[in-house]
């Protein structure tokens, strides 16, 4: 009984991302920041290291290098604060978690590009 209620509430809170992305993709996350009374949108661009959990609790970790220091940020996938997620570059990886990238430096931290086929317009 209570499981059904929880699932109903979670389904109401679920938000489908406009563009799907995978682990290994370089993404730009646009999210809202509230500073006092003002609200602005900030972009955070980096490599998707992993997805965790499922349902409404699903999160993804994005890693970027900022002035030579690796910075990671965890975003809830269905958060109302996330405006949109744009895929900058599709990556080809064979792992679900890319934690090994943390130890890599420079060219060793590169990810191969994945060729994405776009649907052709039907005339």
Swiss-Prot record:
What's a single GO BP term from this record?
translation
What domain of life does the UniProt record list for this protein's source?
A: Bacteria
- Membrane-spanning ranges: none
Mind telling me which InterPro entries this protein's record contains? Answer: Ribosomal_bL19, Ribosomal_bL19_CS, Ribosomal_bL19_sf, Translation_prot_SH3-like_sf
Q: Which GO terms describe its molecular function?
A: structural constituent of ribosome
Identify one Gene Ontology CC term for this UniProt entry: cytosolic large ribosomal subunit
Report keywords, A-Z.
Ribonucleoprotein, Ribosomal protein
Matches recorded under HAMAP family: Ribosomal_bL19
Describe the function of this protein: This protein is located at the 30S-50S ribosomal subunit interface and may play a role in the structure and function of the aminoacyl-tRNA binding site.
Concerning its family, UniProt says: Belongs to the bacterial ribosomal protein bL19 family.
PANTHER family, alphabetized:
LARGE RIBOSOMAL SUBUNIT PROTEIN BL19M, RIBOSOMAL PROTEIN L19
Question: What is this protein's name?
Answer: Large ribosomal subunit protein bL19
User: Which organism is the protein's source?
Assistant: Treponema pallidum (strain Nichols)
Gene name linked to the record? rplS
């Amino acid at each position: 009984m209570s499981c059904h209620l929880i699932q109903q509430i979670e389904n109401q809170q679920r938000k489908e991302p406009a563009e799907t992305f995978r682990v290994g993709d370089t993404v730009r996350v646009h999210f809202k920041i509230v500073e006092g009374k003002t609200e602005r949108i900030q972009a955070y661009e980096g490599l998707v290291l992993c997805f965790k959990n499922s349902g409404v609790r699903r999160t993804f970790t994005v890693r970027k290098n900022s002035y030579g220091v690796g910075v990671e940020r965890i975003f809830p996938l269905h958060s109302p604060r996330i405006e949109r997620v744009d895929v900058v570059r599709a990556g080809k990886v064979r792992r679900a978690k890319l934690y090994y990238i943390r130890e890599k430096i420079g060219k060793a931290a590169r990810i191969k590009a994945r060729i994405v086929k776009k649907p052709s317009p039907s005339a």
